[in-house]
């Protein structure tokens, strides 16, 4: 039957494929273009054509059945949720599933183009599945014919039966590896077997994360064409499901790619500065991790080296069996640095008491951890009132708090190390309670490296002690049992908060955990973890219930935190890391199967949203307190309530950011998936506005500071969405954002006026500076997008704001000034010595092994200079600064990052060279670098990049060169 031609000259609707190809669509289902191209014809809900003839039979493609949502009702528990999203998701998937389309199904009327058919690829290591395809086509044709019949009960029964058979086929369709072919297969040494196993006949591009993807060219290309082409697709730091993948190297590459499109813009300088700042912050975060590693591995020596003190004798102060003995002199040297009587006044411990306990390492670990916890509590109290204290008193106290914080953390790390290897002693409740207390502090100051290492120990010890299993509680007294439960669930809660931020694989197996929940949960009708997950979504418990109403605010917050932790753990286990969605076989399955899985992912998101909303209902009293002011509630209650509200919001943003990586992996058509994800993005946009309003109205600037750790992730996720999805930013959004950051600037000014240079290593200062820098860069990105959207430059932007909010125009000007106090922390250490990326070491390490392997196999291109390889491998080049003044006169094309031999960016390299030799040596080094750089794999010399200083990059840096050097075309439009 011929397809009826449209009599209209224009159509008001178009299918997804016609819109993408920018060709005229007939507006009918299926359109003639999709029949010709042999592809799935999909109309999004808002583009669906009006049905003209329900009895018309269409060739080779199933007719869309009448859509009915009579059975889709929003339950009473989710009336306050955006049910429109859920309904539209169901409509979309109902449309896709009822059509039973597959991109590999042969058309009865049109021969498919096999010129680029991946089916012919000899690299496919799976068995042929034509049998399943033929069965699928058979069911397609049956359903097509059934839908063309007039509706009746018998027809519907046949349709249901056929669908059931089709579902059974889909569920049993599992790709099988062709083991004989695999055994005889000889992959190129540059690519792993896993890389080749992704080769399939259904698609030639598979996303691992939002910003990294596999293509069939990876197994066909002889050589990589950029630095990232030589590295794993999944970044070890950001992993599979990090909500901030946009901050990874591939994410930054996408940002640069977007800016290359705006090279003719009047905002070019601003965009180049922004890229530089992002790379600098990337560098700074790696340095933060490195410093954390140094602090915990050699705490005493590291501290004493910083203050230029060297102990003379070494007498053991630890247990005899310790593999890492402490030194009396080292410990005493650090203890004597504690500011007394200040420490005694806030912790209750004197220097004499500490020295008297040196013989007992476990006792010292408990004491210094108690001191550290008490110090954090008093420090928070001081900061909450610091803005009302006289300057002199404020400055002295602040200095004492900062210096003693670093000292106490040093002692805690030292005694953690020395007690770690006494397995019989650490497998006790006493030790775990100490460790949990230290973990809470680590989490508060965001010491990621130390937190992760201690968390692994805590999880391992508590699991070995049976804290997660009910069987180990039989026969013990209830007080001890509840103490064990409290420790376990605190460790569990901390671990899930860590997952929420990073998207990592959990250390805890959710399916092997069956101990009882704490008493407050049991009183509410939740006996254990499994029952809580089953009941929480439909719980009838109201905020006015005595079981919730009689809880103190702190206990209600503890309930909310553990409740959130449990649904996060379940989502990670059952969705993000579920083999059903993430196995290698799933990646090579046909479109229709992945669409089914994608439907389940959206159902899981909705289930998570329902549970999170129910937790918000249960803890509504906390939300009420957070929106109040002192003196209606104590200041500490206001702070803790605000932190919980921020954590609740942060969780939703993190989950959506994480699951977008999974959506990217399963998706077939970016436009269709983006249409679905945009619904969540719009909701996030509105919630971001609400969070801004919340932070504007909180009682003190310190509350904003306390919420900053949660707020930074929310803001960065939003900034990445602004860059990808271009939501409409209003001037009101700009104003509210500036009002929030104005409160942050008060804290920055406080540090600038009261912090001594010797206290720059204070964890509180470093963490605040890192968080505020990330927020500042996110805001700058959003402001740039506003300028692009409005087609104005920074001067017009400032003038526009000045007309409505003159008091904020100066702050907006600061955001566009890289010499501003806003960016001082990021750029201070590179004012003299130039820009030094930590990724230099990453590049160096990767290329070392790369060229060593090539040398072993004899695959090094003959360049007539073997010393080039040895210099790269040994990394013995002298360390000088290469930021010469002449560099600004020509584009920074030839990269020299790897062999530049630059000093750490925290040190001015010129200090190591006599003044009269500096210029000469710099020129010599520049010449050496240009001659000694080895030939890259792609036979070009642009695979390694040195940005130079900010001024050099802005005046002479080439965005296109930078992009092609590190990324080339290894970025694409992500699914956000």
Curated annotation (Swiss-Prot):
Record feature DNA-binding region, as residue ranges: 15-41
Disordered: annotated span: 104-126
GO MF entry, a single one: zinc ion binding
GO biological process, any: positive regulation of cellular response to drug
InterPro entries: Sec_Metabolite_Reg, Transcription_factor_dom_fun, Zn2-C6_fun-type_DNA-bd_sf, Zn2Cys6_DnaBD
Keywords: Activator, DNA-binding, Metal-binding, Nucleus, Transcription, Transcription regulation, Zinc
Biased composition (Low complexity): 112-123
Compartments reported by the entry: Nucleus
GO cellular component terms, semicolon-separated: cytoplasm; nucleus
Extra remark beyond the main annotation: Present with 166 molecules/cell in log phase SD medium.
The protein's role, per its UniProt record: PDR1 and PDR3 jointly control the transcription level of both SNQ2 and PDR5.
PANTHER family in UniProt: TRANSCRIPTION FACTOR PDR3, UNCHARACTERIZED TRANSCRIPTIONAL REGULATORY PROTEIN
Identification of the protein by name: Transcription factor PDR3
Species of origin: Saccharomyces cerevisiae (strain ATCC 204508 / S288c) (Baker's yeast)
Gene that encodes the chain: PDR3
């Amino acid at each position: 039957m011929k397809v009826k031609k449209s009599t209209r000259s224009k159509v008001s609707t178009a299918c997804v494929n016609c819109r993408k190809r920018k060709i005229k669509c007939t507006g009918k289902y299926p359109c003639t273009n999709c029949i010709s191209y042999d592809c799935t014809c999909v109309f999004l809900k808002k583009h669906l054509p009006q049905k003209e003839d329900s009895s018309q039979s269409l060739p080779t493609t199933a007719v869309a059945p009448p859509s009915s949502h009579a059975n889709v009702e929003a339950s009473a528990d989710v009336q306050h949720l955006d049910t429109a999203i859920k309904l539209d998701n169901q409509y979309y998937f109902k449309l896709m599933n009822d059509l039973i389309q597959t991109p590999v199904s042969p058309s009865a009327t049109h021969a498919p183009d096999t010129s680029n058919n991946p089916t012919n690829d000899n690299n496919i290591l799976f068995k042929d599945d034509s049998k399943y395809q033929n069965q699928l086509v058979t069911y397609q044709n049956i359903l097509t014919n059934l839908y063309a019949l007039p509706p009746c009960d018998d027809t519907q029964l046949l349709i249901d039966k056929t669908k059931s058979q089709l579902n059974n086929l889909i569920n049993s369709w599992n790709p099988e590896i062709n083991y004989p072919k695999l055994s005889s297969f000889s992959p190129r040494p540059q690519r792993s077997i896993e890389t080749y196993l992704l080769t399939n006949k259904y698609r030639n591009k598979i996303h691992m994360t939002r910003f990294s993807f596999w293509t069939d060219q990876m197994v066909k290309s002889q050589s990589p064409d950029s630095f990232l082409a030589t590295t794993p697709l999944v970044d070890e730091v950001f992993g599979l499901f990090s909500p901030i993948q946009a901050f990874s190297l591939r994410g930054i590459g996408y940002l640069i790619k977007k800016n290359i499109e705006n090279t003719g813009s009047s905002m070019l300088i601003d965009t180049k500065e922004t890229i530089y700042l992002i790379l600098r912050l990337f560098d700074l975060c790696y340095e933060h991790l490195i410093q954390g590693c140094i602090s915990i591995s050699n705490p005493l020596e590291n501290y004493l080296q910083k203050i230029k003190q060297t102990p003379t004798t070494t007498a053991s102060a630890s247990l005899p069996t310790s593999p890492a003995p402490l030194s009396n002199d080292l410990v005493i040297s650090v203890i004597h640095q504690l500011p007394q009587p200040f420490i005694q006044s806030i912790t209750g411990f004197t220097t004499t008491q500490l020295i008297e306990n040196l013989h007992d390492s476990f006792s010292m670990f408990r004491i210094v951890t108690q001191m550290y916890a008490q110090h954090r509590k008093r420090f928070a109290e001081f900061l909450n009132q610091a803005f009302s204290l006289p300057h002199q008193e404020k400055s002295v106290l602040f200095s004492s708090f900062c210096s003693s914080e670093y000292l106490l953390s040093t002692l805690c790390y030292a005694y953690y190390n020395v007690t770690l290897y006494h397995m019989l002693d650490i497998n006790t409740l006493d030790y775990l309670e100490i460790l949990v207390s230290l973990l809470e502090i680590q989490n508060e100051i965001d010491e990621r490296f130390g937190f992760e290492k201690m968390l692994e120990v805590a999880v391992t010890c508590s699991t070995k002690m049976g804290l997660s299993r009910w069987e180990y509680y039989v026969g013990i007294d209830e007080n001890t049992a509840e103490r064990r439960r409290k420790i376990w669930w605190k460790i569990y809660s901390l671990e899930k908060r860590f997952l929420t931020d990073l998207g990592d694989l959990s250390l805890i197996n959710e399916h092997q955990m069956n101990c009882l929940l704490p008493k407050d949960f049991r009183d509410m009708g939740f006996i254990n973890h499994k029952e809580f997950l089953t009941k929480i979504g439909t719980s009838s418990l109201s905020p006015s219930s005595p079981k919730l109403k009689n809880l103190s605010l702190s206990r209600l917050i503890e309930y909310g935190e553990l409740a959130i932790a449990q649904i996060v753990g379940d989502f990670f286990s059952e969705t993000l890391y579920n083999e059903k969605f993430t196995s290698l076989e799933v990646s090579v399955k046909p479109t229709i199967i992945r669409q089914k899985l994608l439907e389940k992912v959206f159902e899981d998101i909705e289930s998570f949203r329902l549970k999170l909303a129910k937790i918000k209902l249960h803890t509504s009293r906390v939300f009420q307190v957070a929106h109040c002011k002192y003196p209606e509630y104590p200041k500490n209650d206001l702070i803790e309530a605000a932190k919980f509200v921020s954590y609740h919001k942060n969780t939703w943003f993190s989950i959506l950011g994480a699951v977008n990586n999974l959506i990217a992996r399963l998706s077939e058509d970016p436009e269709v998936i983006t249409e679905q994800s945009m619904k969540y993005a719009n909701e996030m946009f509105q919630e971001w506005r609400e969070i801004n309003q919340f932070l504007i109205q909180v009682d003190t600037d310190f509350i904003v500071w306390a919420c900053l750790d949660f707020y930074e992730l929310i803001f960065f996720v939003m900034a990445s969405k602004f860059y990808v999805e271009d939501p409409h930013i209003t001037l009101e959004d700009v104003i509210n954002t500036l009002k929030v950051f104005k409160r942050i600037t008060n804290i920055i000014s406080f540090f600038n006026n009261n912090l001594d240079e010797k206290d720059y290593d204070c964890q509180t200062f470093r963490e605040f500076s890192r968080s505020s820098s990330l927020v500042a860069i996110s805001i700058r990105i959003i402001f740039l997008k506003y300028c692009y959207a409005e087609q104005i430059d920074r001067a017009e932007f400032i003038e526009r704001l000045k007309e409505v909010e003159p008091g904020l125009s100066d702050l907006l000007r600061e955001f566009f000034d890289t010499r501003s106090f806003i960016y001082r922390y990021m750029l201070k250490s590179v004012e003299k010595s130039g820009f030094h990326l930590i990724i230099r070491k990453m590049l160096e390490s990767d290329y070392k092994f790369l060229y060593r392997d090539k040398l072993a196999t004899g695959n090094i291109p003959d360049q007539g200079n073997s010393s080039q390889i040895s210099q790269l491998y040994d990394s013995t080049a002298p360390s000088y600064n290469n930021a010469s003044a002449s560099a600004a006169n020509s584009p920074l094309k030839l990269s020299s990052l790897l062999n530049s031999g630059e000093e750490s960016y925290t040190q001015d390299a010129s200090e190591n060279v006599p003044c009269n030799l500096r210029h000469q040596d710099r020129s010599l080094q520049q010449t050496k670098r240009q001659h000694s750089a080895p030939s890259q794999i792609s036979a070009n010399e642009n695979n390694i990049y040195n940005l130079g200083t900010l001024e050099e990059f802005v005046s002479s840096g080439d965005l296109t060169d930078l992009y092609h050097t590190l990324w080339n075309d290894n970025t694409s439009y992500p699914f956000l």
